[in-house]
């Protein structure tokens, strides 16, 4: 560890994890639940396994949410009441940050002094709360943005809504105040430095991972039978929230010409996910698009699945398609590759790291449906190439594990704690010197 002190001296005993707008216990693929939920839950499991207590603060969204949930050994989820349980969109939550911050502060005040050693906030809403808690508790704040409004606004999908200026300002404030900033890839580090003027020496690049015990290669025949997919069908799968940003419509538009021109390939499109966001947010809209394109018979819609079920979907697929307009990483891509399924993805953000172009799949620059059709045509016509990419996918995915992610988090935490300790000692020395002179 490139830190001056021993690991024990800079390893937190207990951390407060802030996730205002979505609970790590929620099902990914529905509403606002997605990769961030998976990230928080999996890293919490890894940290708890190393003896670090993790308390996750999230907003209660149901009257049945218990105030405290002992979610796993060493992991406690605190459901904070902040605004009505239902009827609030993520865009409404800035008005509830005061209530949420009050709940966090009151929970900490009921514990002994020095209860938390560090705060790790996720997404800018949580960063605002973490900023206040950091100053109140006198502990370091480590922040992970997961997405940046300015990046998203540069690449809006048709029908999507631009992120408001208030969010951009909020992200700037958190970027200025956090002790350390964690990003998913070197691409995101460059974006954060350029857009928010953050010195690179305050940024730590930590790759997310995949649960390599769950997402493994295997026989997808059982999943195909369950989904009503024939053994000889070529399955192109989209997994994620149904929103313009994720671009599931691009898969339909790109595959439609192939379905019409090559009925012998028996191409099946599988869409796994639920509604979220603005614009093209309901499966009904995609169903209507499939009908318009004349491929309704070849498209299957499935609700989100838990990890074990999702692994079966990946194994049942010949290709997983990730056509997002922006991604800070792309967990779906890594999970699919870990199951031995090649990925066709947009060459944006962290997907250029998550997918090894020509080795574990293909990266496509841009969102022109014709270019996507050409790549899908090549891959659906060449079983040998798909087999080669499948082998490369499994190997590439081994680079990404949650254990390695936890190693990176602990390194960032250590830097933050040590810097805070040194700053405190400097202040004390100055005060002592001032006292002597007095």
UniProtKB/Swiss-Prot annotation:
Mg(2+) binds at residues 314-315, 317, 341. Keywords: Glycosyltransferase, Magnesium, Metal-binding, Transferase. It catalyses: 1D-myo-inositol 3-phosphate + UDP-N-acetyl-alpha-D-glucosamine = 1D-myo-inositol 2-acetamido-2-deoxy-alpha-D-glucopyranoside 3-phosphate + UDP + H(+). One of its GO terms (biological process) is mycothiol biosynthetic process. 1D-myo-inositol 3-phosphate binds at residues 21, 32-37, 90, 123, 147, 167. UDP-N-acetyl-alpha-D-glucosamine binds at residues 27-28, 35, 241, 246, 305, 327, 335. Its EC number is 2.4.1.250. GO terms for molecular function: acetylglucosaminyltransferase activity; D-inositol-3-phosphate glycosyltransferase activity; magnesium ion binding. It is an enzyme of class 2 (transferase). Catalyzes the transfer of a N-acetyl-glucosamine moiety to 1D-myo-inositol 3-phosphate to produce 1D-myo-inositol 2-acetamido-2-deoxy-glucopyranoside 3-phosphate in the mycothiol biosynthesis pathway. Belongs to the glycosyltransferase group 1 family. MshA subfamily. Homodimer. This is D-inositol 3-phosphate glycosyltransferase. It comes from Tsukamurella paurometabola (strain ATCC 8368 / DSM 20162 / CCUG 35730 / CIP 100753 / JCM 10117 / KCTC 9821 / NBRC 16120 / NCIMB 702349 / NCTC 13040) (Corynebacterium paurometabolum). The gene is mshA.
């Amino acid at each position: 560890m490139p830190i001056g002190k021993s690991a024990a001296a800079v390893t937190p005993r207990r951390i407060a994890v802030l996730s205002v707008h979505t609970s790590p216990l929620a099902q990914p693929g529905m509403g606002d639940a997605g990769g961030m939920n998976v990230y928080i839950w999996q890293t919490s499991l890894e940290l708890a396994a190393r003896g670090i207590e993790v308390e996750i603060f999230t907003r209660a969204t149901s009257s049945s949410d218990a105030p405290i949930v002992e979610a796993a050994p060493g992991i406690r989820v605190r459901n904070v009441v902040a605004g009505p349980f239902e009827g609030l969109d993520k865009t409404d939550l800035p008005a509830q940050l005061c209530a949420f911050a009050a709940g966090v502060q009151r929970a900490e005040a009921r514990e002994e002094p020095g209860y938390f050693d560090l705060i790790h906030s996720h997404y800018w809403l949580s960063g605002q709360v973490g900023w206040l808690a950091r100053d109140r508790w006198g502990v370091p704040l480590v922040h992970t943005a997961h997405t940046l409004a300015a990046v998203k606004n540069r690449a809006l999908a048709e029908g999507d809504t631009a992120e408001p200026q208030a969010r951009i300002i909020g992200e700037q404030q958190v970027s200025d105040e956090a002790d350390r900033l964690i990003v998913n890839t070197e691409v995101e580090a460059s974006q954060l430095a350029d857009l928010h003027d953050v010195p690179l020496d305050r940024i730590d690049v930590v790759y997310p991972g995949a649960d390599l015990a769950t997402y493994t290669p295997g026989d997808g025949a059982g999943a195909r039978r369950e989904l009503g997919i024939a053994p000889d069908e070529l399955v192109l799968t989209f997994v994620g929230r149904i929103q313009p940003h994720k671009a599931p419509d691009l898969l339909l538009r790109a595959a439609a010409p192939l379905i019409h021109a090559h009925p012998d390939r028996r191409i099946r499109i599988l869409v796994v996910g639920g509604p979220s966001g603005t614009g093209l947010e309901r499966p009904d809209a995609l169903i209507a698009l499939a009908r318009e394109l004349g491929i309704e018979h070849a498209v299957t819609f499935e609700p989100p699945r838990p990890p074990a079920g999702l692994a079966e979907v990946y194994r049942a697929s010949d290709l997983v398609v990730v056509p997002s307009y922006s991604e800070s990483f792309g967990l779906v891509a890594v999970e699919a590759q870990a199951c031995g399924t090649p990925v066709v993805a947009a060459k944006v953000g962290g997907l250029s790291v998550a997918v090894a172009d020509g080795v574990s799949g293909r990266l496509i620059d841009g969102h022109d449906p014709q270019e996507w059709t050409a790549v899908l045509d090549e891959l659906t016509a060449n079983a040998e190439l798909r087999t080669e990419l499948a082998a490369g996918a499994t190997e590439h995915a081994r680079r990404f594990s949650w254990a390695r992610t936890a190693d990176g988090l602990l390194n960032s935490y250590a830097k933050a704690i040590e810097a805070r300790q040194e700053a405190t000692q400097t202040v004390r020395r100055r005060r002592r010197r001032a006292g002597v002179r007095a």
